Amino acid sequence: MKLFTDIISNDEMCSDGYEMKLVEDVVYEVDAAKIVVSDGDVDIGANPSAEEAAEALENGAEQVINIVHSFRLQSTQFDKKSYLAYLKGYMKSVKAKLAESNPDRVPAFEKGAAAFAKKIVGSFNDWEFFTGESMDPEGMVALLNYREDGVTPYLVFWKDGLRETKI
């Protein structure tokens, strides 16, 4: 199993225990699911029936996104202007780290990141934003959106902002 941590904050962001797809060689799209949790519950990956989910919610449980819950990602807010200001600084930090570790990757990162950033801005109101557990303002902000069905959540993580560790 591989664990992916933010190269800036060192927060654990996701793992390959979830279905991951590399998109345009710049971001990972990671399929998520809504789960119901209550105090003391542990997510073992089972999919409860709708009746069980409704019953659990009646007993004070809450519905959460599995990856957000498992990696203790923290919800944060941006307007378009503040997100673009954050993204500019974040991309500069990632580029600097990349220049040290893999300088040949820098041009592809810059081109891919700029193109994907345009997609984010084009559908800005569809996205939700999450930081790592430490809430480091310099660290990665993961993006949450929903598939075309309007029900299935997925998260987007910047490929070059993650460090892969085998566990």
UniProtKB/Swiss-Prot annotation:
Residues annotated as domain TCTP: 1-167
Superkingdom of origin organism: Eukaryota
The keyword Cytoplasm is annotated on this UniProt entry: yes
A Gene Ontology molecular function term of the record: calcium ion binding
Compartments it resides in: Cytoplasm, Cytoskeleton
Major localisation: cytoplasm
Keywords: Cytoplasm, Cytoskeleton, Microtubule, Protein biosynthesis
Pfam families the UniProt entry points to: TCTP
Protein family: Belongs to the TCTP family.
Function in brief: Involved in protein synthesis. Involved in microtubule stabilization.
PANTHER family: TRANSLATIONALLY CONTROLLED TUMOR PROTEIN-RELATED, TRANSLATIONALLY-CONTROLLED TUMOR PROTEIN
Protein name (record): Translationally-controlled tumor protein homolog
Native species: Mycosarcoma maydis (Corn smut fungus)
